[in-house]
């Protein structure tokens, strides 16, 4: 399992790792004692990797060298098995900052999907915080828990409720309500009851018509101020010697993020 609490950062049995070849290509692998990694007619035992330091170079049976790295959370999210469409790292970063997710926060989330956002929330709230995730689909819940287990290991600050958040939120005095749902406006009345004063409501939506509907619901509730909507566009650059230019492809629109602060009325 992967954990930054592991000071020596050595690879362990059951951990997800990335092989990086000389061209920078990544090959994900889950370590399992006794198994063998094979690549283009070459091989190396998983046992020869377990116990090695993060960032080490290993040599396969015919001499090819690979760098072995623990995946970052962003890399893991993009490679992990998916039961549902994930929120991409560029949007997760915006959610963590605009949602002001902090250590020891109590966060209600719906739905859990494949667990991408959940893992970032768990990291942000830390061991003293808690993430309560509402998810009606059992297959999504199971897939997310598997993904979280592989990357985070045993997690004590996650509570999964297989309930429909459209019918209500059982928690009171929570710090944040984070929604990745088709109709978040149906949750606004429940969020009013669940959020503490000063708490933040945040939702992630793919279309601007959905955004318009949820913003109207937030305003009509009379309980929210500072209602803002944004989207995050990311463009990488090619920088090589004297050749400096934007990459030909960029990650443009994926979704809109709407935030609002709850106040006493």
Please provide the spans of the model-predicted regions.
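Conserved SAM-binding loop and adjacent beta-strand
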Residues: 7-9, 79-92
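C-terminal substrate-binding/active-site "lid" region of AdoMet-derived donor-dependent transferases
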Residues: 188-256
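S-adenosyl-L-methionine
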Residues: 134-184
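Conserved class I S-adenosyl-L-methionine
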Residues: 102-113
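Conserved SAM-binding loop of SAM-dependent methyltransferases across substrates and taxa
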Residues: 114-127, 193
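N-terminal auxiliary segments of SAM/dcSAM-dependent transferases
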Residues: 1-70
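Glycine-rich helix-loop-beta junction characteristic of Rossmann-like nucleotide cofactor-binding loops
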Residues: 97-102, 124, 152, 169, ...
């Amino acid at each position: 399992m992967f954990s930054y609490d592991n000071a020596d950062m050595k690879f362990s049995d059951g951990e997800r790792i990335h092989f990086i070849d000389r061209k920078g290509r990544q090959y994900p692998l889950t370590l399992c004692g006794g198994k063998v990694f094979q690549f283009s007619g070459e091989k190396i035992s998983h046992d020869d990797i377990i116990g090695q330091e993060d960032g080490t170079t290993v040599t396969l049976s015919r001499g090819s060298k690979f760098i072995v790295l623990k995946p970052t959370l962003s890399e893991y999210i993009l490679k992990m098995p998916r039961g549902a469409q994930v929120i991409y790292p560029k949007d997760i970063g915006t959610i963590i900052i605009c949602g002001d997710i902090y250590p020891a926060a109590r966060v209600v989330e719906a739905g859990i999907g494949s667990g991408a956002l959940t893992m970032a929330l768990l990291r942000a709230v830390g061991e003293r915080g808690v993430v309560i995730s509402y998810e009606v689909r059992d297959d999504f819940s199971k897939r997310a828990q598997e993904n979280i287990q592989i990357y985070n290991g045993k997690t004590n600050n996650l509570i999964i409720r297989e309930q429909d958040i459209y019918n209500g939120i059982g928690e009171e005095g929570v710090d944040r309500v984070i929604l990745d749902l088709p109709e978040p406006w149906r949750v606004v009345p429940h969020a009013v009851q669940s959020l503490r004063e000063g708490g933040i409501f945040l939702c992630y939506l793919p279309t601007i018509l959905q955004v318009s509907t949820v913003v109207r619901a937030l305003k009509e509730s009379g309980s929210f101020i500072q209602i803002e909507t944004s989207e995050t566009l990311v463009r990488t650059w090619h920088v090589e010697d004297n050749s400096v230019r934007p990459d030909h492809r960029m990650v443009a629109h994926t979704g809109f993020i709407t935030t609002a602060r709850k106040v006493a009325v």
